[in-house]
Amino acid sequence: MAARIQQSPQPGGGKRKGKAQYVQAKRARRWDGGGPRQLEPGIQGILITCNMNERKCVEEAYSLLNEYGDDMYGPEKFADKDQQPSGSEGEDDDVEAALKKEVGDIKASTEMRLRRFQSVESGANNVVFIRTLGIEPEKLVHHILQDIYKTKKKKTRVILRMLPISGTCKAFLEDMKKYAETFLEPWFKAPNKGTFQIVYKSRNNSHMNREEVIKELAGIVGSLNSENKVDLSNPQYTVVVEIIKAVCCLSVVKDYMLFRKYNLQEVVKSAKDLSQLNPKQAAQTGNGKEAKLESGDKSSQNDPAEGKNNQQVVPENSEELGPTESISETHVVNEGVAKPELASQVTEGSESNENDL
């Protein structure tokens, strides 16, 4: 009797599952066989920032990446979907048709997993991550920016920056050091050498220290080849460090200053803007120092992912620069007006900060 009294309130007065629980379970089933659902260590891809319209950003990214991906690697090949059974072969074939349909669904899910470009959850607002498979992200993105830089043809509206991510690891200092020792070898290990800078940005992460990360990475680059030197004005290579939650994204890119920090909105109008600069500013830009433009300022003010009230800080001490360069002073310049490109960027927002070495 007591057991009946305890059970009776449950159907009518017990706690009911919220809608979010059902939606979450449905999403989990929908993602079965679709590859990684979110940004995680061990994948490659392209990190894209946008301005408050992530869905449109994903659409633009697919369109742009497929256009240039087909140009570089050829069109994607998929299984013929017309081979599915029609179901009109009689009742005896119903079981066989159902089995073939299930096999076809499994193949379709496998095909989805092997898609060349696939959007996954980045873990930060106004940031889209497109996982890539079978391509080299840094070469593809460089090809896109090079073409846009030459043609000056604007192909996107909401995409701001497009950064290739050649490798990901756990966002802990020891994991990053161990991973970077082998990751950076193709560019900096003897006999390879070059000038470099380090660009650091963190989102939704509070346990990483930017000074420690920069110091350790600069030390690794210097240990690979003593001839690797820091160049803050026009480096051959830029080491991009993007941290989102507990994942560290790494890449080494070329022409970072020439392509306006890989900003698609700035690349198309850089020539026009340079013609309007005064001789002093033009000379600075010609030497590889980037001048911030009004449109660039507006985009960064409207983009929470890039941070609000950004500042550029030049860490010019021997500890941050590593064994290759030592300078003595530190300058802080507000990022509200046109100015030369400096060594570091630090976003003083609650969720992100950026630092260029």
UniProtKB/Swiss-Prot annotation:
Tagged with keyword Lipid biosynthesis: no
SMART domains the record matches: THUMP
THUMP domain boundaries: 147-254
SUPFAM superfamilies per the UniProt record, alphabetical: THUMP domain-like (SSF143437)
UniProt-listed InterPro entries: THUMP_dom, THUMPD1-like
Residues modified to N-acetylalanine: A2
Source species, domain of life: Eukaryota
Region named Disordered: 1-38, 74-95, 276-357
Keyword terms, alphabetized: Acetylation, Phosphoprotein
Function: Functions as a tRNA-binding adapter to mediate NAT10-dependent tRNA acetylation modifying cytidine to N4-acetylcytidine (ac4C).
Protein name: THUMP domain-containing protein 1
Organism for this UniProt entry: Bos taurus
Lineage: Eukaryota, Metazoa, Chordata, Craniata, Vertebrata
Gene: THUMPD1
